[in-house]
Amino acid sequence: KPPMAKELLEFYTPEQLRAHWLSLGLDQRAVSFSPKAFDTSVSRKGKDGEPDLLVKDDPRVVDPALKESAFLTNIFNRMARSCLYGAANACGGHLPISEPHQEVIDAAQEVLLKYEQLAYGFDAHSALAAVDEYARAENKRWGEASKAAQGNDEAYDQALADAFYALKTITLLMHPAVPEGCERIADALNFPHEEFFSWENAFMGPKELAAKLGQSAEEHQLEELPPRFDFFKAHPSQKN
């Protein structure tokens, strides 16, 4: 029988489950929910009297329920950490002073409008897919720009400005799916939730939002994160 909610929460975080379910597109097609933690089918037959190896115990088997978690930890979390650690090192713990490139602003506006249209049609699966595609592209942009800017403070500030603009957009759009992690990012960026997650401010970058709140980029203090901080934490049962 299907696991109860209480049982699921013994192996997965609410954020992981919500992101997975929203991505399945259950309103469009029939998809099975197959969390590895509850899969008791045989992965490998035991030999010489040894017990069979079940899927739930086989480290070689990828957990379908954690597919979206790879995006949260490998793309989204990395982007947030890159921005905050980068600003701590290069901007004195404040926002970058550069204006984002127009192509960065255009890309953000495009995904915002696409997401809003899809959400209006209750197409959560496609809306999250649009954010995923956008976030991966912006993460790649940041990786290339930050690498090219090594040793050039002005170019690095510009790369950070682009990344911060994208980070705000990603965090706003992912908030309905993973609110806890997104609100933790807003806290680290030192913005009130009611302003940061307001759709009235959706087309504002962090620098513009700070200005609305009466601060310049140089005045807006960011949180100093400890090393290797995770905004999207794994369930204790998933840690090696």
Q: Language-model features: where?
A:
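Short alpha-helical "patches" and their helix-cap loops
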Residues: P35-S43, P59, A90-I105, Q150-D153, ...
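Secondary-structure edge/capping motif, primarily at the C-terminal ends of alpha-helices
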Residues: A87-A90, H94, Y115-F122, E138-G151
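Short, hydrophobic/aromatic alpha-helical segments in well-folded domains
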Residues: M4, K114, T169-L173
